[in-house]
Amino acid sequence: MAKFEVVNKYLDTEKYPQCPVVLPVRATKNAAGYDFCASETVLIPSYNHNVEQLKGYMADKTMYSLPQVEGITKFTGIKPTLVPTGVKCKLDSNQYLEITARSSMPLKYWLVLANSEGIIDSDYYGNESNDGEICFQLINLAPSDIVIQQGDKIGQGIIKTYITVEDEEEVTTERTGGFGSTDDKD
């Protein structure tokens, strides 16, 4: 059975006398998604600040490999902003949490989820890197910076189950970190 919890760092009453975390809830009785709120106030810079720099960098190129895209990110400083929620999600081993943008985000605020949707695996919960804190990767397409206030709704999550193929070799690798830790780094 799935359960939302506050990550440990926000349980420190000396640092956070009043816990800033709002646990996700469904807005209506038939809503599939649980609304997530920002646990901190976060500035999301406008993507447009670096567009001219990006155009100059890309002028003579037509296609990019992933390492080149990493170079573009380092050169221009253009990258998504992680907005923390202060929430972790305990899931059964055959479940995952799909996080998506709220439908109003692009229309009202010019904000989009950088990866369209995020997949939170059951073994992300409580990892030693970030205690399983769920963050949303947002990109600001507005002409100016946007500030997300603590408590603002920033996305939604839908708990889903999955199945595996019957002839899969047993996977014994275990998660060793948090955000992005399952990337293959040969």
Regions found by a protein language model. Name each.
Residues 1-186:
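DUTPase catalytic domain/fold
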